[in-house]
């Protein structure tokens, strides 16, 4: 077994809670779509979590008596998760950076997400160039893929 293989086997993956997410991202309720992030491997991959509750304002009109989380908010949750790990990977405590959504490609929605579901955002980096990142994301509920997309974002330094 090589030294490189041994190092990979002992790699400790990072996690961040809601307080750290709030320190990293400028988003706030009702537009913050991620509650915690685990299995963070630098800016390469992670799993973000969103506890979907009936109290969220979009359920009042989407749809009355049949609450379904809007697909665009699921994609937004993917992007916020990816943005948070990009900023987190840069290190240091810093004020929230502005993260601008650049692209959404190959978005697919497979089944409705409802109050009571726990969304998992599985994000994997596809590419990075200067202050821009591209990720492939899968949103899952109970292990089942409910949405997927490729997202790109730019972090604007202040």
UniProtKB/Swiss-Prot annotation:
A GO CC term attached to the entry:
membrane
Q: What is its main location?
A: cytoplasm
- Which reactions does this protein catalyse? a (3R)-hydroxyacyl-[ACP] = a (2E)-enoyl-[ACP] + H2O
Any Gene Ontology biological process: fatty acid biosynthetic process
What CDD domains would the database entry show?
Answer: FabZ (cd01288)
Task: Tell me which UniProt keywords the record has, alphabetically.
Answer: Cytoplasm, Lipid A biosynthesis, Lipid biosynthesis, Lipid metabolism, Lyase
* Keyword flag tRNA processing: no
Pfam families given for it?
FabA
Name of this protein: 3-hydroxyacyl-[acyl-carrier-protein] dehydratase FabZ
Q: Which GO terms describe its molecular function?
A: (3R)-hydroxyacyl-[acyl-carrier-protein] dehydratase activity
- Subcellular location, in the record's words? Cytoplasm
Coiled-coil-forming residues are: none
Spell out the catalytic residues. 62
Q: Give the family, as the similarity comment puts it.
A: Belongs to the thioester dehydratase family. FabZ subfamily.
Report the transmembrane regions from the record: none
Q: Give the EC number.
A: 4.2.1.59
Function according to Swiss-Prot or TrEMBL: Involved in unsaturated fatty acids biosynthesis. Catalyzes the dehydration of short chain beta-hydroxyacyl-ACPs and long chain saturated and unsaturated beta-hydroxyacyl-ACPs.
């Amino acid at each position: 077994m090589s030294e490189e293989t041994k190092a990979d086997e002992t790699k400790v993956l990072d996690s961040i809670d809601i307080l750290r997410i709030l320190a990293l991202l400028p988003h706030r309720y009702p537009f913050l779509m991620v509650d915690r992030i685990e299995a963070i491997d630098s800016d390469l991959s992670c799993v973000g979590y969103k506890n979907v509750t009936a109290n969220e304002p979009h359920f009042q009109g989407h749809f009355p008596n049949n609450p379904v989380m809007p697909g665009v908010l699921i994609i937004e949750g993917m992007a916020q998760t990816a943005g948070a790990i990009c900023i987190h990977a840069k290190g240091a405590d810093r004020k929230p950076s502005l993260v601008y959504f650049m692209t959404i490609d190959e978005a697919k929605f497979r089944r409705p997400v409802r109050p009571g579901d726990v969304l998992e955002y599985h994000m994997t980096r596809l590419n990075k160039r200067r202050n821009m990142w591209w990720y492939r994301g899968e949103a899952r509920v109970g292990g089942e893929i409910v949405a997927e997309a490729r997202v790109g974002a730019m972090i604007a330094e202040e």
